[in-house]
From Swiss-Prot:
The protein's Enzyme Commission number: 4.3.3.7
Gene: dapA
Organism: Lawsonia intracellularis (strain PHE/MN1-00)
GO-annotated cellular components: cytosol
UniProt name for this protein: 4-hydroxy-tetrahydrodipicolinate synthase
Residues carrying the site annotation Part of a proton relay during catalysis: 47, 110
């Protein structure tokens, strides 16, 4: 474990739909564009990919397409999380069989497990399938918080766990994960607003929503921070700030898919209970995309 490096700018891919079905041709085109733009890795079937409303067959189609299209040019991470440990194991098995380089496991949502329950959940998954695991902590969606002390315990006892996507937006907690865990443990932010400060603290990159829209800018931001060119990095951070804010003006991935439709990268379609962006927020998003030159005025 640990040979694969999950670092830099990694895009949490959207899932394009067309008349209720997955648009695989569009998905492959998006993946190819991401790689052409220099992205460092891809997450398929994560939160941004509307994983909650995918069937097993659709999950297989998407992971298979992502692995095939990347052709090992960048690492592929498969979202495999569930609040049902047995289902999480099943998804992990599928991802491994289809050739994913790693799996992303969100903390179980709704059940509200204790820290011991979280530890046992990840330990059980790792005991069944040997594949690099990234933990995923996003309390705003799950209703539970994976504490830094628990992360450190997991890393010590479960060698399959090679990193974490921390989407708390809490820099103190992010810092403690780095402090408590061994050197080489890969700590990525899942919050586009905190790419700059989190990497200065020692994080190794981001699993990003905004890189669906501006992959090259996010790649450059991460690269500049790694090279300690902080003044240039700050400029990109502030250039991206208005767009970052709009990505969460309504539930992810509603704004990002809307932006991609305005860029003519996909047809705008969601699965319920997600619905289209409100008219007022659509106008704000369209205006911002025009102002920063992503779409023509």
């Amino acid at each position: 474990m640990g040979q694969i490096q999950f670092q830099g700018a990694i895009t949490a891919l959207v899932t394009p739909f067309k008349k209720g079905e997955i648009d695989l041709e569009c998905y492959r085109e998006i993946i190819e564009w991401q790689i052409e733009q220099g992205i460092n890795g891809l997450v398929s079937c994560g939160t941004t990919g509307e994983s909650a409303t995918l069937t097993y067959e659709e999950y297989k189609l998407l992971i298979k397409a992502c692995v095939e299209q990347t052709k090992s040019r960048v690492p592929v991470i498969a979202g495999a999380g569930s609040n049902d440990t047995a289902k999480a194991i099943q998804l992990t098995k599928i991802a491994k069989e289809l050739g994913a380089d790693g799996v992303l496991h969100v903390t179980p949502y709704y059940n509200k497990p204790t820290q011991e329950g979280l530890f046992q959940h990840f330990k059980t998954i790792a005991s069944q399938e040997s594949i690099p695991i990234l933990l995923y902590n996003v309390p705003g969606r799950t209703g539970c918080n994976l504490l830094p002390e628990t992360v450190a315990r997991i890393v010590q006892d479960i060698p399959e766990v090679v990193g974490i996507k921390d989407a708390t937006g809490n820099l103190e907690q992010f810092s403690e994960i780095i402090e408590f865990c061994p050197i080489g443990f890969q700590v990525l932010t899942g919050d586009d607003f905190t790419i700059l400060p989190s990497m200065i603290l020692g994080g190794c990159g981001v699993i990003s929503v905004i890189s669906n829209i501006v992959p090259a800018m996010v790649v450059e931001l991460c690269s500049l921070i790694e090279k300690n060119k902080l003044e240039e990095a700050r400029q990109i951070h502030y250039n991206l700030a208005p767009l970052c804010r709009l990505m969460f003006v309504e539930t992810n991935p509603i704004p990002v898919k809307t932006a991609l439709s305005l860029m003519e990268k996909l047809e705008l379609e969601f699965r319920l209970p997600l619905t289209e962006l409100s008219p007022i927020n659509f106008t704000k998003l369209e205006s911002t995309l025009k102002n920063i030159g992503i779409i023509s005025k």
